[in-house]
Amino acid sequence: MSETLKRLSEVIESRKPANGGDPEKSYVARLFVKGDDAILKKIGEEATELVMAAKDARVSADKSKVLYECADLWFHSMVLLAQFDLTPQDVLDELARREGISGIEEKASRTAD
């Protein structure tokens, strides 16, 4: 796993109130205290901002906002992973598991819940 992702994951984990994160001093700790809905709302906002940045980049040819908004989406997705005691490595492992499998085949192999 990238050292940057590893360090960021560790910082996010340290912001959990159970690990001493203070919601008065830490944005991430505040998200953890507010719970799943607050984190999911933020992910929805960031996903929308990424979509809009990508549309704007097609017109302006300026990709910097796409990068910025994608970083925000990744960050908040990492907060959600931590909320469920998952890590970026878990995502990388899942991607590796899917490697070489067509998307159609992978989707068909899922069991209905």
Swiss-Prot record:
GO molecular function list: ATP binding; phosphoribosyl-ATP diphosphatase activity
Keyword check for Protease: no
Pfam families: PRA-PH
GO BP terms, alphabetized: L-histidine biosynthetic process
Subcellular location: Cytoplasm
InterPro entries according to UniProt: HisE, PRib-ATP_PPHydrolase-like
First-level EC class: hydrolase
SUPFAM superfamilies according to UniProt: all-alpha NTP pyrophosphatases (SSF101386)
Record field: catalytic activity: 1-(5-phospho-beta-D-ribosyl)-ATP + H2O = 1-(5-phospho-beta-D-ribosyl)-5'-AMP + diphosphate + H(+)
Keyword Cytoplasm: yes
Alphabetical list of PANTHER family matching this protein: HISTIDINE BIOSYNTHESIS BIFUNCTIONAL PROTEIN, HISTIDINE BIOSYNTHESIS BIFUNCTIONAL PROTEIN HISIE
Name of the featured protein: Phosphoribosyl-ATP pyrophosphatase
Organism: Herminiimonas arsenicoxydans
